[in-house]
């Protein structure tokens, strides 16, 4: 493979160069390798060469919503985007809140060519009221816990869940959108929402829960993942609490550091998602968070819907999109390997 941009996690380097492969093994990486006449040459000019990517935030819609996607088609989409390991969220139907559902998913996942991990839900039926049997679910193969798609509104319940996760030494991941602030979710409250004639979701809906959960993380000692950050102020909060010793892991999506809410004016419902695309200032703050390590995870939050669902009016359609392909199409000048 010649003329590629080679990302090497083992050496934490990015170089332009060539890779020699023999018998399915990498033999040599160098700035330039002269091939023999018998060797196949792949020109990787303008392409990134990297190990298989890990996407820690995926919705394969299986079980329950397989008209949108299932484990097999989702796995194909992941591989096409260069992703070879995924973590699936628990908001399926039935919810991954018990061992039989978890075991069914993990068993079917073995047939796929990528590696699939499954998170279990924090609460039964994603209601935020009763903890699942986290110990049993971990022993059955759950890699972590999340009610992603729905926030944990009760602070005491959230703290209890963090304490349990800490005792089991597993991460707990949180969707941070307080519905009390929101009308017409999926659209940032601001100049664009005013043009569209809707109220939308102000950034305080995210920031208020991020502030709360950063403190709960600090006090509980749990490994807490703040999912799909969309607000610059959220980045500031996480930076501050990390400095105080909170075991926080912050996640950003490609769409939140490459697009703004202006995309709604051009793309309509295709640019509607939870949390919403926000302002240019928020986008730049997320990039700064990636640069300085405040944000330490890039994940797609791949969440496909059917074409019929996305074709509904702006205030009715489902929020979400197929995002695994975004990993192949981040605009030049904005990709993490160029800026971080």
Regions found by a protein language model. Give the residues of each.
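A glycine-rich helix N-cap at a beta->alpha junction
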Residues: 107-122
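Divalent metal-binding segments
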Residues: 59-68, 87-99, 119-131, 146-157, ...
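Gly-rich Lys/Arg/Thr-decorated short loops/hinges at beta-loop-alpha junctions or inter-strand turns
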Residues: 55-58, 83-88, 115-117, 189-198
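Histidine/acidic residue-rich metal-binding segments in metalloenzymes
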Residues: 131-298
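Metal-associated gating/positioning segment near the N- to mid-region
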Residues: 47-109
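Divalent metal-coordination and catalytic microenvironments
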Residues: 4, 19, 24, 46, ...
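Gly/Ser/Thr-rich active-site loops/lids in small-molecule metabolic enzymes
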Residues: 206, 316-333
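Histidine-rich, glycine-flanked metal-binding segment
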Residues: 5-52
């Amino acid at each position: 493979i010649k003329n590629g941009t080679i990302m090497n996690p083992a050496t934490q380097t990015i170089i332009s160069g060539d890779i020699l492969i023999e018998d399915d093994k990498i033999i040599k990486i160098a700035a330039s390798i002269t091939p023999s006449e018998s060797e196949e040459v792949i020109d990787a000019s303008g392409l990134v060469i990297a190990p298989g990517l890990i996407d820690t935030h995926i919705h394969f819609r299986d079980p329950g919503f397989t008209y949108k996607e299932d484990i097999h088609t989702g796995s194909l989409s992941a591989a096409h985007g260069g992703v070879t390991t995924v973590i699936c969220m628990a908001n399926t139907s039935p919810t991954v809140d018990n061992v039989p559902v978890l075991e069914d998913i993990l068993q079917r996942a073995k047939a796929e060519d990528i590696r699939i991990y499954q998170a279990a839900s924090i609460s039964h039926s994603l209601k935020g009221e009763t903890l699942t049997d986290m110990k049993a679910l971990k022993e059955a193969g759950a890699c972590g816990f999340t009610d992603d798609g729905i926030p944990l509104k009760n602070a005491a319940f959230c703290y209890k869940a963090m304490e349990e996760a800490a005792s089991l030494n597993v991460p707990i991941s949180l969707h941070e959108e307080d519905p009390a602030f929101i009308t017409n979710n999926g659209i940032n409250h601001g100049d664009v929402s005013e043009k569209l004639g809707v109220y939308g979701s102000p950034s305080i809906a995210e920031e208020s829960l991020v502030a709360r959960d950063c403190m709960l993380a600090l006090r509980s000692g749990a490994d807490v993942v703040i999912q799909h950050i969309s607000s610059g102020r959220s980045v500031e909060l996480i930076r501050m609490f990390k400095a105080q010793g909170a075991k926080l892991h912050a996640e950003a999506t490609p769409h939140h550091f490459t697009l703004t809410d202006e995309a709604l004016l051009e793309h309509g419902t295709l640019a509607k998602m939870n949390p919403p695309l926000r302002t240019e200032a928020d986008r730049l703050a997320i990039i700064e968070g990636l640069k300085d390590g405040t944000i330490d995870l890039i994940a797609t939050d791949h969440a496909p819907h059917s074409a019929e669902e996305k074709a509904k009016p702006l205030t009715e359609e489902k929020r979400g999109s197929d995002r695994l392909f975004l990993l192949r199409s981040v605009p030049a000048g904005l990709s993490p390997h160029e800026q971080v």
